[in-house]
Amino acid sequence: MSISHPDTVLIIDFGSQVTQLIARRVRAMGVYCEIVPFQLALEGVKRLRPQAVILSGSPYSVIDDGSPRAPMEIFEIGVPVLGICYGEQVMCVQLGGKVESGHRREFGRAFLEVQEKSALFDGVWEKGSCYQVWMSHGDHVAALPEGFRVIGTSKGAPYAAIADEKRCLYAVQFHPEVVHTPDGTKLLQNFVHKISGLKGNWSMASYRDQAIATIRKKVGKSRVICGLSGGVDSSVVAVLLHEAIGDQLTCILVDHGLMRKNEAEEVLKLFRDHYNIELIHVNAANIFLNALEGETDPEKKRKTIGRLFIEVFEEETKKIEGVEFLAQGTLYPDVIESVSAIGESVTIKSHHNVGGLPERMNMKLVEPLRELFKDEVRSLGRELGLPEQFLGRHPFPGPGLAIRCPGAVTREKLEIIREADAIYLDEICKAGLYDEIWQAFVVLLPVQTVGVMGDGRTYEFVCALRAVTSVDGMTADFYPYDMEFLSKTAARIINEVRGINRVVYDITSKPPGTIEWE
């Protein structure tokens, strides 16, 4: 589902790990932008008609044979272009300059000395002063193309910032998009607002109105189904669609018996009772738990749950007449990953999604969130009036509690983990910590230990508490609870949950660990 935007920045991705940060910074300015891999850059120009272009960094060396290039047309269409790191080098090489392998590499914090005034530095950096930046390069520009001048230098990069103001071409060897370049966002604002003249009119309010109009045009009078889990993405999709097409929407909640305590009831209460959305609740717990019986391999558990979800969802859909469209909560990072500039990434875990549904069910897709990042989805949810209880929820995996029970999943273990998890989250909320934490949950270990309760000996399970801070889930640190909180939470779990006699806290960061245990 494509929505038109009057002011657009095109970001050409050469495979940098921080390309998405560029997009997030630009969108935070109220300007719409899209990332396209370098192979599709020309198609992106024709489709988006951008008012500015940014060239990303890259793990490649511009000196190597076959390394990525930008289409020459990018420099000839008359819009401002900003090259970042590899983007600077590729701009120079393609326009007649020279890049060499550096004898002095720069990785991490560095200092740039401003040599000349420039529109890029206007109101931020002064000529003759030094400023902290973040570098990550081995090669460096050795000779400038005709028309360029040097505006900033560093110890390892004699052309750390360059400009050809006549053609509105700018480039920097450092990364302005990362927080380690303190003034980086201001420099990007200069490029987007002052140099490119973009106004910053893009907002979630305008996106909501455009999305509703686009949905109505695409769907017409047809019926749409939507898988609803109660998570942020599916909740926002459901409410947005309902606002657009009303009773043409039917939502299906597949209850696989692996949800948290009272979760299904909360979803039904909000969407069926409050929003009056037609919602079919499928209690499929027996189907899922019987299929998972005795299975200990985490990958097989995920695949079994994914396969059964599709089968149950498909069976329910057959009972609804006239369905032509399937709504999905695909987000922009999913879209970016699917057309990666450097190919598919290594599979760490199978992701639980309904991506296999359209092919099997012969339906058209409606993906109203496919242009948004996660934080933007939450903002859209607020525009739609969704309660914070749903919008502020921690991420919850599609396979549910099955991957928080290492080893075989049983009904007894699920009841134990539900109760322990509810207590843990309750204590987090009471302490006012919920919004400080990216994700928090209990893992029930397939280990039993000896304990003493009263005058009796116990032999019960160990549970691990997990809590992490993160920005995007790609990296994470454990949350530094104080001992009083951990002591109080552990005491409640042991005293109130039958089946647990020992509590531990997981202090592993990501990497090397993952956030979930399976």
UniProtKB/Swiss-Prot annotation:
Its EC number is 6.3.5.2. SUPFAM superfamilies: Adenine nucleotide alpha hydrolases-like, Class I glutamine amidotransferase-like, GMP synthetase C-terminal dimerisation domain. The active site is at 85 (nucleophile), 175, 177. Pathway: Purine metabolism; GMP biosynthesis; GMP from XMP (L-Gln route): step 1/1. InterPro entries: Class_I_gatase-like, GATASE, GMP_synth_C, GMP_synth_GATase, GMP_synthase, GMPS_ATP_PPase_dom, NAD/GMP_synthase, Rossmann-like_a/b/a_fold. It is an enzyme of class 6 (ligase). ATP binds at residues 229-235. Disulfide bonds: none annotated. GO terms for molecular function: ATP binding; GMP synthase activity. Residues 202-393 form the GMPS ATP-PPase domain. Residues 8-201 form the Glutamine amidotransferase type-1 domain. Keywords: ATP-binding, Glutamine amidotransferase, GMP biosynthesis, Ligase, Nucleotide-binding, Purine biosynthesis. Catalyzes the synthesis of GMP from XMP. This is GMP synthase [glutamine-hydrolyzing]. It comes from Bartonella quintana (strain Toulouse) (Rochalimaea quintana). The gene is guaA.
